[in-house]
Amino acid sequence: VEKNTFATSAYIATSAETAFQYLCSLKNLDDWTLFSRMQEQIDEDTWIGTASGYHRNLYYHVKKLESPLFYGIEWHCGLEYDQYFQVYPVLLFPPDYIEPGTDEKGVYFHWLSFVDPGRQTQMIMQGIHTVHTSECRSLKANLERREGLTTAAKGRYFIDTDTIYVDAPVELGVEYLKEVKNIDEWAHLVRPVGELSGQSGDFLDEYDQKVTISIRVHSLSKYYLLEEEYFYPEHNFYQRSVALLIPAAYSFADPEATGFILHRITFWKNEGQFTHGKLQIEDFGAESMNIKRFLEAKAGNLKSFDRGMSYVPVHKLQQQELVGSH
């Protein structure tokens, strides 16, 4: 687990467009957050307001994400106007993206948070999971109450994630992961059938079932979104997942930060379990470790893998090396 990254998700019984419009208005933070209260509007997309994790006010800024796949935004926070040190990407997945052809309505909300280890306080680190998880439930209730619901709606799926820091250029990661032939190197549960090239290819899974794996890459804000689709033709079964490849310099607002965060977003049934594809979040996590090892080796950063799954700022690495030399 990447210890500087936090994610929370919810199924919300409202339309994706309704949720998107609601989230784009910073003033609505007053209604569902613990104590983000907007006090003064600076421009169309920026306010000054109170904060749950600080004694002083913050600047809040919202940015719409341009994607043909689904709605998304980013919230940004900082102590000065246009100088933001926290970024919170939000994606809204329609049910038919998760399960093509489904009749389920609503939207799956996913909220990602980064806390720069160079700026974080102990309270932020200890409290962010609790606060954001509760705020996510509050957001769900606010939107569902507007739809006339009196209790929480339950979706057919839930979201789980795996996150790891990769000390290699994000462009190297994109070039490596978009080539389906490289799956034979970093994935251990499938084997290729014949020669592979491009962004789609045929494989056999761990039970010798035929599966076509497709990879698609999209630019999103200052980072990349990678779609991975498993399709079992003999069972007409799809399993889709999404990965965000976010430069550490952007996620932690630190130009000295190298590498990128690999954040994998996966979808699982609330009732029953899959019989094909990846069957547990650890299947994704194991792959991510392999991806990290291969990419860091390609980048010449052979020491990074031993440091674990989390980003460590340059100055902390220098301190550790100094201590280790004495």
Give a label for each model feature.
Residues 53-56, 64-71, 81, 207-211, ...:
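Short, charged/polar surface micro-motifs in flexible loops or helix N-caps
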